[in-house]
Amino acid sequence: TAYEIVSRDWSSDVCSSDLEDATQPTKHDFGKDIIPSLIHKVPVYAYRFYDENKKASKYWRDVGTLDAYFEANMDLCGVTPEFNLYDPEWPLRTYQPQAPPAKFVFAEQGRRCGQALDSVISPGCIVSGSTINGSVLCPNVRVHSFCEIDQSILMPGVRVGRHARIRRAIIDRDVLVPRGAVIGYYSDEDRRRHTVTDGGVVVVTANDEPYIAPIDERALAAELA
């Protein structure tokens, strides 16, 4: 994303004139409309986003669409992502939640094994006998047993019930994914129940009702054994 730094007095004048011009056919976007119109009127400066030591541009990604946001997060799960969260030369200045470390429980033979592969798991998360693959779990997410989470983003406070399967999805904050829910596997059901991006990413909000798969009696018996 992009940031513009302006003085309060200057921004008041600019915003006022932009509001007066609101009937004009523009999106009133800082980068596309407002700044270009000001270049010949007032001093405008750009920060050269370049690493002189490495002789390369620093990381920048436009996340103005859901697909772009999704791909930027998926890139973090790679072995050598373009944006390295662990680079001591570029620390993140952000709020750190007061939460315990992530925890993975159950190591039984078969499906009930709490594990995460090629994923970013935030503090406060508990993965209870489920597999997380290529996904980003935000703080305080709880995934109950026998779930499969693949290439997905789970926002803070999400709860996932047992036997749920989620693939290529963004689950909104504090959503309770019900037991047996299937998200990202059946395109017709996904489009009928959720928002689906042009890139095929399923976006699930608190008001959605995910498709529930029929209960596998053998799996249920094994769970209760």
Name what the model sees in each region.
Residues 20-225:
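Left-handed beta-helix
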Residues 1-15:
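Single conserved hydrophobic/aromatic residue that forms the stacking wall/gate
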